[in-house]
A protein has these predicted regions:
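Flexible, glycine-rich phosphate/dinucleotide-binding loops
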Residues: 12, 108, 131, 155
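Structural recognition of alpha->loop->beta junctions
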Residues: 53-56, 60, 111-131
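P-loop/Walker A phosphate-binding loop and immediately adjacent motor/lid segment at beta-alpha junctions
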Residues: 77-83, 87-91, 132-193
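A generic structural signal for alpha->beta connector loops
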Residues: 96, 118-119, 143
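N-terminal [4Fe-4S]-dependent radical SAM core
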Residues: 1-22, 35-41, 167-170, 177-194
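Local cysteine-cluster metal-coordination motifs and their immediate loop/turn environment
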Residues: 22-37, 198-204
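Conserved Radical SAM active-site core
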Residues: 1-4, 11, 17-18, 32-100, ...
Length: 204
């Protein structure tokens, strides 16, 4: 598995304050994605022990709510094994931290993946430029869904996802300031080199 960046103290890619791992490799190549440098599975850096420890150091902090896997696509064939192994270690070491994952795949196609048992919230679906809406919470286009994975898996019919939250009016008052702010523009990835790059909802 390779990655492009580890973002710390992130408030845009999931509930609460989070650490975000941006992996390399994506086959969706969504039109309008402003993060195409993550599409190449051979790009970025090798995810090694030092990178893992960097994440663990963040998760050690009591104010960090959890980790978000984004990219790129964490479910790209080059990433699945590495992501699953890291998720397993995180759940064992930090059982109270939440795991979010962004993917361009649809829930219906991935719901039986064994790694789903480790994921708390999944944002699914390709970014659709025609459906782009910067007022949406935690996603870039209206076709995408923010899914409560464990609640969905506990149902008899797992093909109907339980949504983690609504998009606009049904978001509880105060949520924007107490947890994660509602998006007013594309998410920002701050690479170690100091260059800011906007990331649309593709972020799978």
């Amino acid at each position: 598995m390779r990655y492009h960046n580890i973002t710390k103290d992130d408030m845009l890619n999931g509930d609460g304050l989070r650490v975000v791992l941006w992996v390399a490799g994506c086959e969706h190549c969504c039109k309008g994605c402003q993060n195409p440098m993550t599409w190449d599975q051979n790009g970025g850096l090798l995810f090694d022990e030092s990178a893992k420890q960097e994440i663990f150091e963040q998760l050690d902090q009591p104010y960090i709510n959890g980790i978000t896997f984004s990219g790129g696509d964490p479910l790209h064939c080059a990433n699945r094994d590495g992501v699953k192994q890291l998720m397993r270690e995180i759940k064992e070491k930090y059982p109270d931290k939440t795991i979010w994952l962004y993917t361009g795949d649809s829930w219906e196609n991935i719901k039986n993946y064994s790694m789903m048992k480790y994921i708390d919230v999944l944002v699914d679906g390709e970014f659709k430029l025609a459906l782009r809406d910067v007022t949406l919470l935690w996603k870039g286009s209206s076709n995408q869904r923010v899914i409560n994975v464990q609640a969905t898996l506990s149902q008899e019919d797992t093909t109907v996802p339980v949504l983690y939250c609504g998009d606009h009016d049904d978001i509880p008052m105060g949520r924007e300031t107490s947890h994660a702010p509602k998006l007013t523009d594309e998410n920002i990835i701050q690479f170690n080199g100091g260059m800011d790059i906007t990331c649309c909802g593709c972020q799978a």
